[in-house]
Amino acid sequence: MMKNERRSVNWPMIAGVAAVAAAVGFGAAHLPVSEKSPASTQAPEAQKPQSAPVKPGLKEVKIPATYLAAANIAVEPVASAAVGTEILAPATVAALPGSEAVIVSRAAGAVQRVQRRLGDVVKAGDVLALVDSPEAAGMAAERKVAQAKADLARKTYEREASLFQQGVTPRQEMEAAKAALDVAQAEALRAATVAQSAHLASDGRSVAVVSPIAGKITAQSVTLGAFVAPQAELFRVAGTGAVQVEAAVTAADTSRIVAGSEATILLANGSPLSARVQAVTPTVTGSARVATVVVVPAQPTDRLVVGEGVQVRLRTAVADAAALSVPEDAVQNLDGRDVLFVRTQEGFRPMPVLVGTRSGGSAQILSGVQAGEQVATRNAFLVKAEMNKGGGDEE
């Protein structure tokens, strides 16, 4: 009976312990879930930057075109050329054959009148100055004498021809008169040609200094009243038409340059002009032993002045069409990254790029931009400065 009583007492205790254990187990089972739930929702968010870095928002800095001109910021297309396949050569702007004239005096004498001055625009045939010369008087006299002899010979021939028709004189006299007429006319033509080529003035005692082409007077070395010698340069006139650029390259580089290839003319202020190679001389000249590469602008321009010193960037025949390059000044460091400032409608947008080789003032672009895209080159750091001032628009 004692055993039965104990057995009846223990069952309620066991049931109570089981109930307490169940309650504790249930709470323990739910407690980690409730504490773990916020962590589980936050962990993916914390791991996102590690698995897929978020690209910083690119800014566009708005720069008006007037500021570009004032700040001398150049914009050039990304070139399809590998670094090391471009040649940067010194060059000089020259006039095309026939577009520049050196004007001289055709006779010795004193300058009587100066009718044009440095910088004036002239037309072909305009008189620039008059030179009072004894030679002019001599040419005028010879022309008159020759013309008088020709007139006399013509009258003599007409008379002899009439007498021959009448049967008064023999044929020999008429033929002699005809020969004398031919000689006199030839002499008159020679005297007239000499006077015309010397630009003999109508007064018969001075010669005119005449411009043979239309253009602008670029040099003047004449003074009123000064004595000038024959063939002495008095004026220089340059035509207002096209010009060419003559670049000096080494003999080894001539085989790498072909006519028709692309080139870029860099002005004294750094502004670029698209151009192409017109010709390459097959020989070297001068003490420097250099060859000449003739480059012509792709479009007519008035920004090239004859005699101006420029630079020419020549692309060689072995250039890799798949490679890209830009002037080294175009690559800027922004927030620790190499970027190019790509031209937009209202300004520039920084474009991260991967830069390869840098050589000869050019930088190889491996990725980030495409050939032909317009980017800031010269003074690109000014665009970077504008962006650092907070002028960009966050997208």
UniProtKB/Swiss-Prot annotation:
Pfam families: HlyD_D23. Residues 37-50 have a biased composition (Polar residues). Residues 140-193 form a coiled coil. One of its GO terms (biological process) is copper ion export. It is a single-pass membrane protein. One of its GO terms (molecular function) is metal ion transmembrane transporter activity. InterPro entries: Co/Zn/Cd_resistance_CzcB-like, CusB_D23, MFP_Cation_Efflux, RND_pump_MFP. Residues 35-55 are annotated as: Disordered. Induction: By nickel. The chain crosses the membrane at residues 13-33. It comes from the Bacteria. Signal peptide: none annotated. It is found in: Cell inner membrane. Its main location: membrane. Gene3D superfamilies: 2.40.30.170, 2.40.420.20, 2.40.50.100, Helix hairpin bin. Keywords: Cell inner membrane, Cell membrane, Cobalt, Coiled coil, Membrane, Nickel, Plasmid, Transmembrane, Transmembrane helix, Transport. The products of the genes cnrA, cnrB, and cnrC are likely to form a membrane-bound protein complex catalyzing an energy-dependent efflux of Ni(2+) and Co(2+). The mechanism of action of the CnrCBA complex may be that of a proton/cation antiporter. NCBIfam families: 8a0102 (TIGR00999), RND_mfp (TIGR01730). Belongs to the membrane fusion protein (MFP) (TC 8.A.1) family. This is Nickel and cobalt resistance protein CnrB. The gene is cnrB.
